[in-house]
A protein has these predicted regions:
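Mobile cap/lid helix-loop segments that gate and shape the active-site cleft of serine hydrolases
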Residues: 1-48, 67-77, 85-89
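Alpha/beta-hydrolase-fold serine-hydrolase catalytic core, especially in secreted/extracellular enzymes
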Residues: 45-47, 53-136
Length: 136
């Protein structure tokens, strides 16, 4: 299970292709060689998201996020969804667009928790937990 909140858009869309925001120790310092040439980066997020198929992937992409464009996320999802479909699970890529800025609103956060629980087959009712397999 993967959950992303305000986490990505196409490198070409990110601040018009200026990758300076990525070039920090806490993110991807090695992107420095591409700072002014996003088109030269040998990957983009549609490929990374496609690689997650068939896992459950929940993406919160707010419509008023100043860092990451929601419509770019939709283009990425459109490009990645056929790979999910090849695995028989196009519905496993779920995109949400709350009307807010760079935030993870409570409704989407709770839905993401449910998505995680579904993916992990977790329940708060111990009588509904799947039986443990013996350790070998």
């Amino acid at each position: 299970v993967v959950v992303s909140s305000c986490g990505f858009d196409s490198l070409l869309d990110y601040y018009g292709g200026n990758l300076k925001g990525y070039v920090q120790e806490r993110y991807m310092l090695s992107m420095g060689e591409f700072v002014n040439n996003a088109a030269a980066v040998p990957w983009d997020y549609y490929e990374l998201i496609a690689c997650l198929a068939p896992r459950l992937v929940y993406v919160n992409a707010p419509v008023r996020d100043a860092n990451f464009r929601w419509d770019s996320v939709d283009r990425i999802a459109s490009a990645a969804r056929p790979v999910f479909a090849l695995h028989g699970s196009p519905e496993n890529l779920l995109i949400r667009h709350p009307d807010c800025e760079h935030d993870f609103p409570d409704n989407e956060r709770m839905e993401a928790y449910e998505w995680i629980a579904r993916g992990l087959q977790w329940t708060s009712d111990p009588t509904r937990l799947p039986p443990k397999e013996p350790v070998r």
